[in-house]
Amino acid sequence: MCPPRGLLLVAILVLLNHLDHLSLARNLPTATPGPGMFQCLNHSQNLLRTVSNTLQKARQTLEFYSCTSEEIDHEDITKDKSSTVAACLPLELAPNESCLASREISFITNGSCLTPGKASSMMTLCLSSIYEDLKMYQVEFKAMNAKLLIDPQRQIFLDENMLTAIDKLMQALNFNSETVPQKPSLEGLDFYKTKVKLCILLHAFRIRAVTINRMMGYLNAS
């Protein structure tokens, strides 16, 4: 029987905040880190920096749009679509590997983050889940930025450095990653709602970027 998603989330958050860095690294699903993993760690660190900078700019520019973490309605666009928190759990918290492997996520095996032939299925699932998260946010951000670019006020746009950081980490996780251009839908276009949605997504994505960066750090140290 698979443990409830809520319990898994609480467990991983407790571990991330209270367990020793190297101790946790030793207990994660094992893999052999190589130069590619170090490169992926650099990409994840750059992603965290750029999304933090983008969020800070949005909070300043959209100060009248309720853009602080205390004011927004938090939303996770990856809910029920990916399993990053569960897939990247330490082994002792995920004794039933089949519970995770049964998730409908395509395994990636052609990225540079793992040494070919030396990654466990759970480690591959962890990185595959991270890739799926990035892909979902990439689609949302690019569609949103396309709308912001036609805003007559031209008040705010997404930082290209953040979009590039997403692309680079996705490519490191999957060599076949492709960027799909997004065209804005003009039906029911509301720039105010778009900017509020931007704040919500940036806050959620920064939290996910923190998780991704920690996971990459643990994998690189293991």
From Swiss-Prot:
InterPro entries: 4_helix_cytokine-like_core (IPR009079), IL-12 (IPR050676), IL-12_alpha (IPR004281). Gene3D superfamilies: 1.20.1250.10. It is found in: Secreted. Residues 1-25 form the signal peptide. GO terms for biological process: immune response; interleukin-12-mediated signaling pathway. Heterodimer with IL12B; disulfide-linked. This heterodimer is known as interleukin IL-12. Heterodimer with EBI3/IL27B; not disulfide-linked. This heterodimer is known as interleukin IL-35. Interacts with NBR1; this interaction promotes IL-12 secretion. The keyword rRNA-binding does not apply. GO terms for cellular component: interleukin-12 complex. Heterodimerizes with IL12B to form the IL-12 cytokine or with EBI3/IL27B to form the IL-35 cytokine. IL-12 is primarily produced by professional antigen-presenting cells (APCs) such as B-cells and dendritic cells (DCs) as well as macrophages and granulocytes and regulates T-cell and natural killer-cell responses, induces the production of interferon-gamma (IFN-gamma), favors the differentiation of T-helper 1 (Th1) cells and is an important link between innate resistance and adaptive immunity. Disulfide bonds join 40-113, 67-199, 88-126. PANTHER family: INTERLEUKIN-12 SUBUNIT ALPHA (PTHR48485:SF1), INTERLEUKIN-12 SUBUNIT BETA-RELATED (PTHR48485). Glycans are attached at residues 42, 96, 110. Its main location: secreted. One of its GO terms (molecular function) is cytokine activity. The gene is IL12A. This is Interleukin-12 subunit alpha. It comes from Equus caballus. Keywords: Cytokine, Disulfide bond, Glycoprotein, Growth factor, Secreted, Signal. Pfam families: IL12. Belongs to the IL-6 superfamily.
